[in-house]
Structure formats: structure tokens, C-alpha cells
């Protein structure tokens, strides 16, 4: 029995959300999705009991977007545990370290159960690390005791547990999509709306763009200091969204023919953004984790220690700048940010293609198994692999570079919701549009539903 089997066996002992006996209607699934979204926003506004009020907030935008989290609340850990668990298992499966066929229902069942156990383990670990590491008591005269640690850790763990079950509700078919995608989209949308209309009472009444225009309509709105939303960021946001929608619609088509039905020809469309948002997402997760560790080290080592200062300097240069003013004020940071994110995005892009089974060899094997071949060439995996290699690796490099460049430019010019957030949000909206369109088609034409073997509650 392997590790995945042990984790799956443990996971099956936990309470689970039952799958609907028959597929719910689209409106019912939308209603469930709306309920989950409302619960997410409620949890994002319930502060943790037992921590100093002044230590609620202060979260870096990148962390808030990547993990759909809200500092000092029940959503402090956000989707971090479940995303980390999922990525680890997918990487191990893709690297063939763990043998698991995700195309097989039994393999998917094991994956889901193992992911739940691993996510709960990460939730418990992060909850303890946040509290014992002094995350909520840094800079205060309060000396927390064991009861304080236990109380806050329990709240963090319960918040993460609810997120895991929210995702299970969605994944089992009660809602549409996944809770992970839904929460990321909600967080990005909230950030964009806040940048346009937000105010911070007693600190910055004119924080958002609209309040700033009303209070002080002059040329300073083109570029504001301290990372405040400005007109440059607003127009950058619009341009980034339009460009992302266009790029995600682009395809590179490879001509194919059917071996079973001679004379039938078609094309296999490869997304121009072949690696989608995965490389830049992995870069964002890496930098977010480094920022998280920085906060924990501040308590253990002290902000004056040499080791902490070296570490915080590295994290500072890897973190995205907050708008045009900061980018110009610190050109060295901007240059390091551009170089590091570009290189890491390309490296992660190639890694993901190999790990996720998107490389030429595995794609060729899939086409051969499907009875497909390229016109004028032998139906040989090695021949097909050589042809696909001319498409896939250049697409991997180019798409990783383009995605990184778009996110970097968006961050430098202060796009609302961050460049990474906009990239994720546009991709998620595209997925939701496709899912809802499909569901509406199935409800409009019941015959399609019967062909697919689906029933309505």
C-alpha cells in the first residue's frame, strides 16, 4: 500500500459531502454557488477572537489574491492549505513518483480523499505556525499564553476546514466550478471595486480613485504615491483585461486525420497561452510563501538581526512594486522584479508542461490512442512527437514569457487587483462562461442530456 492509498483510506473516514442523486438544474447550482460566495464574504469579515485589533489587516495584496485570504479573520488561511495539497499531489503524480491514473474514477476518488487529508494537515500546521510564530502579537506588549495560542489556532483551523468543505460542495456537483476559483475571483473583484470606490476612515478618505477625483481632481491622479489607485492603474487594468481576453481566445491549430474513418480531416487546437496561468501562479505562490515566512521570522529572529534583514531584502526585491511611483523611485527593485519573475515563469512553464503531461511525447501518445494522425505521416508516436515538439516547446516558452510580461507590466503600472489577480480572474471568468453556456445548452436541448446520461432533480 502506497502513501496515496494510506492518505485516501484516512480521508474516507472523514465526513464527506454526498453527491446529488441526479444533477441539479442550472438555477439550483447557481443558488448554491451564491450561498457559498456569501458565506465566504461573511467569514472574510469575522475577526479572530483573542488577537489585538491593531494587528488585524496589513496583508500584502499578492497574498490576499493568491490565497483568497483576509488577514485577521476566519479566512486568514484562505485556500492556501487546499491549493498547496493539490499542487503537491499533482506534481508527485506528474513526476511519476506516485502512480495514480486521474482519468480513472477510482484514481480520482483516491486523489480527492488524499487531498482532503493533506489539506487538513497543512491547515493545522499553518494555524499553529501563525500563532506560535507570533503573527498576531508582533509589536504589542501583550504576552500570549497557551490558551491564546490554542484559541486562535482552533479558529484558523476551523476556517480552513469550512473552506475545504465549501470546495467539496462545489466539486460534488451542487455548485458550478470550484470554491477555489470562486474565492479567487471574488477576491480580485473585491480588490478592483475597493481600488475604485474605497475609503479608509481616519487614514485616507480619498484612497479609491473615485473619492480622489471628487476631492482633488488634478494631474496628481495620473500617478499617486504609496501604492494608492490612480488613473494610470485604471487604464492599465482595462488594457490588461482586453489583452488577456484576446490572448486566451487565440489558438494554434495542428492538422490531423482519422485512422479509423479515412478521409475525415480536422484540426487540433492548442491554446496560444499553452501553459495558461500556471507558471505565474506558481511564482506568485512562491513569493507569497516567502512573505509569510518573513512575518514568522520577524518574531523568532527579531527585525534587527542580520539574518532577518538579508532575508527581508531578498523578499523585498522579489515582491511586485506598487505602482508607477514606487517603480521609478526604486529602479533596482523594479529591474530585479522583472528579471526574477520572467526567469521563474519560463522555468515553471517548462516544468509544468513536463509534470502535467502536456509534453510532446504524452500528447502524441494520446493522439495515437484516439486513432488520430498527421496527414502525410506515419502513425508512429515518435514521428508525431517530433512534429508536436516544433509546436509545443516554442508555445511553452512564448506563452510563459508573454504571461510574465503582461503581469509584470500590469504591476509596474499599478493595475487594480494586481497583474496576477487579473490573469487569474479573466481565466476563471472564461471557464465559468464555458460551463454556464454548456449547462444552458443541456437544459435547452434535453436530448443532449439524455445522450450524456444526465438527469435533472
Swiss-Prot record:
Assigned GO CC terms: plasma membrane
Membrane topology listed for this record: Multi-pass membrane protein
Biological processes, Gene Ontology terms: intracellular protein transmembrane transport; protein targeting
Superkingdom per UniProt: Archaea
Intramembrane segment ranges: 60-67, 68-79, 80-88
Side Cytoplasmic, residues: 1-20, 89-109, 172-178, 252-276, 353-395, 433-457
Classification via PROSITE patterns: SECY_1 (PS00755)
Gene3D superfamilies the record matches: SecY subunit domain (1.10.3370.10)
Transmembrane segments: 21-47, 60-88, 110-134, 147-171, 179-197, 230-251, 277-298, 333-352, 396-414, 418-432
InterPro entries: SecY (IPR026593), SecY/SEC61-alpha (IPR002208), SecY_CS (IPR030659), SecY_dom_sf (IPR023201), Translocon_Sec61/SecY_plug_dom (IPR019561)
Entry keywords, A to Z: Cell membrane, Membrane, Protein transport, Translocation, Transmembrane, Transmembrane helix, Transport
UniProt subcellular location: Cell membrane
SUPFAM superfamilies listed in its UniProt record: Preprotein translocase SecY subunit
Residue numbers on the Extracellular membrane side: 48-59, 135-146, 198-229, 299-332, 415-417
Function per UniProt: The central subunit of the protein translocation channel SecYEG. Consists of two halves formed by TMs 1-5 and 6-10. These two domains form a lateral gate at the front which open onto the bilayer between TMs 2 and 7, and are clamped together by SecE at the back. The channel is closed by both a pore ring composed of hydrophobic SecY resides and a short helix (helix 2A) on the extracellular side of the membrane which forms a plug. The plug probably moves laterally to allow the channel to open. The ring and the pore may move independently.
Quaternary structure note: Component of the Sec protein translocase complex. Heterotrimer consisting of alpha (SecY), beta (SecG) and gamma (SecE) subunits. The heterotrimers can form oligomers, although 1 heterotrimer is thought to be able to translocate proteins. Interacts with the ribosome. May interact with SecDF, and other proteins may be involved.
Family: Belongs to the SecY/SEC61-alpha family.
Protein name, as recorded: Protein translocase subunit SecY
Protein species of origin: Aeropyrum pernix (strain ATCC 700893 / DSM 11879 / JCM 9820 / NBRC 100138 / K1)
Gene: secY
Amino acid at each position: 500500500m502506497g502513501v496515496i492509498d494510506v492518505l485516501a483510506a484516512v480521508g474516507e473516514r472523514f465526513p464527506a459531502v454526498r453527491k446529488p442523486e441526479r444533477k441539479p438544474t442550472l438555477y439550483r447550482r447557481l443558488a448554491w454557488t451564491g450561498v457559498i460566495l456569501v458565506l465566504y464574504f461573511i467569514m472574510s469579515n469575522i475577526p479572530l477572537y483573542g488577537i489585538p485589533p491593531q494587528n488585524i489587516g496589513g496583508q500584502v495584496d499578492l497574498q490576499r489574491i493568491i490565497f483568497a485570504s483576509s488577514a485577521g479573520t476566519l479566512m486568514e488561511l484562505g485556500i492556501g492549505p487546499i491549493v498547496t495539497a493539490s499542487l503537491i499531489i499533482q506534481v508527485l503524480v506528474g513526476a511519476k513518483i506516485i502512480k495514480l491514473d486521474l482519468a480513472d474514477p477510482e484514481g480520482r476518488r483516491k486523489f480527492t480523499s488524499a487531498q482532503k487529508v493533506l489539506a487538513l494537515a497543512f491547515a493545522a500546521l499553518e494555524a499553529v505556525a501563525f500563532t506560535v510564530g507570533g503573527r498576531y502579537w508582533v509589536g504589542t506588549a501583550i504576552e500570549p499564553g497557551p490558551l491564546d495560542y490554542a484559541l486562535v489556532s482552533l479558529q484558523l483551523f476551523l476556517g480552513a476546514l469550512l473552506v475545504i468543505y465549501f470546495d467539496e460542495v462545489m466539486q460534488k456537483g451542487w455548485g458550478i466550478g470550484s470554491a477555489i476559483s470562486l474565492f479567487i475571483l471574488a477576491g480580485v473583484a473585491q480588490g478592483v471595486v475597493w481600488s475604485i470606490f474605497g475609503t479608509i476612515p481616519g487614514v485616507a478618505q480619498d484612497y479609491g480613485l473615485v473619492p480622489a477625483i471628487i476631492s482633488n481632481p488634478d494631474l496628481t491622479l495620473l500617478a499617486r504615491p504609496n501604492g494608492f489607485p490612480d488613473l494610470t492603474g485604471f487604464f492599465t487594468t482595462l488594457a490588461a483585461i482586453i489583452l488577456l481576453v484576446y490572448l486566451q481566445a487565440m489558438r494554434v491549430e495542428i492538422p490531423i486525420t482519422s485512422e479509423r474513418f479515412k478521409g475525415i480531416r480536422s484540426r487540433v487546437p492548442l491554446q496560444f497561452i499553452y501553459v495558461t496561468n500556471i507558471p505565474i501562479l506558481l511564482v506568485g505562490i512562491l513569493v507569497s510563501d516567502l512573505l509569510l515566512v518573513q512575518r514568522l521570522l520577524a518574531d523568532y529572529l527579531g527585525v534587527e538581526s542580520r539574518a532577518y534583514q538579508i532575508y527581508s531584502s531578498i523578499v523585498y526585491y522579489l515582491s511586485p512594486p506598487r505602482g508607477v511611483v514606487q517603480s521609478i523611485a526604486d529602479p533596482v527593485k523594479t529591474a530585479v522584479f522583472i528579471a526574477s519573475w520572467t526567469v521563474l515563469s519560463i522555468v515553471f512553464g517548462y516544468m509544468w508542461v513536463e509534470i502535467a503531461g502536456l509534453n510532446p511525447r504524452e500528447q502524441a501518445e494520446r493522439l495515437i490512442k484516439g486513432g488520430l494522425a498527421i496527414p502525410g505521416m506515419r502513425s508512429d508516436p515518435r514521428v508525431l512527437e517530433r512534429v508536436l515538439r516544433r509546436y509545443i516547446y516554442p508555445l511553452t516558452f512564448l506563452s510563459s514569457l508573454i504571461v510574465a510580461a503582461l503581469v509584470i507590466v500590469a504591476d509596474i503600472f499599478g493595475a487594480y487587483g494586481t497583474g496576477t489577480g487579473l490573469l487569474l480572474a479573466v481565466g476563471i471568468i472564461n471557464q465559468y462562461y464555458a460551463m454556464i453556456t454548456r449547462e444552458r445548452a443541456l437544459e435547452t436541448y434535453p436530448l443532449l442530456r439524455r445522450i450524456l446520461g444526465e438527469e435533472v432533480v
